[in-house]
Amino acid sequence: MKILMVTGYKPMELNIFKEDDSRIQFIKASIEKRVREFLEEGLEWVIISGQMGVELWAADVVMELKEEYPVQLGVFPPFENQDGRWPDALKEKYEELTMTADFFKPIYKGDYQGPYQFRTKDMWLIDKSDACLLLMDEEFPGSTKYFYDTLQKTAKDYPVFTITPQDIDDVVEDLRMQDPHYWD
């Protein structure tokens, strides 16, 4: 696998409303754990659409991993000005990402036109990647359901690796056990 797509929940679906929410560090650690494994096996690119939440957090992880691995980050939003209605803090983060990513190109020119742009974006990212890392709870799929349904219908031999709530709990426990005060 050379190209991995990463996607998952938007922050609101996880009841995360601030960038300093402590749960983000656990999600990032879970993403890092999986991406690091793929990098050890030869992963070269991580691609995302740049939506807020899991995808922006994955971008942060990839940018940090660039210090250790020759990984590249591609950002392919469904349309220009994807961040038009986002909170200012997330807009700034997204703008910075568009400048620091190794490759950035919206799939459609112009602003939002209709839901077909999201479906096209999903299919394009699936077509351009070798596998997907998806943060999703099958009991509460939220907006990831649309992407997951697309995968089920169209990408039969496409590997999907998931990060589940249990995976995040395991990472939380690992991080707690690394804290020297945990053992006091």
Swiss-Prot record:
Q: Which InterPro entries does the entry mention?
A: YspA
A Pfam family (short name) is YpsA
Q: Which residues form a coiled coil?
A: none
Q: What superkingdom heads the lineage?
A: Bacteria
HAMAP family cross-referenced by the UniProt entry:
UPF0398
What family does the Swiss-Prot or TrEMBL record give for this protein?
A: Belongs to the UPF0398 family.
Q: What is this protein called?
A: UPF0398 protein OB1025
Q: Which organism is it from?
A: Oceanobacillus iheyensis (strain DSM 14371 / CIP 107618 / JCM 11309 / KCTC 3954 / HTE831)
Taxonomy-wise, where does this protein's organism fall, top ranks first?
Answer: Bacteria, Bacillati, Bacillota, Bacilli, Bacillales
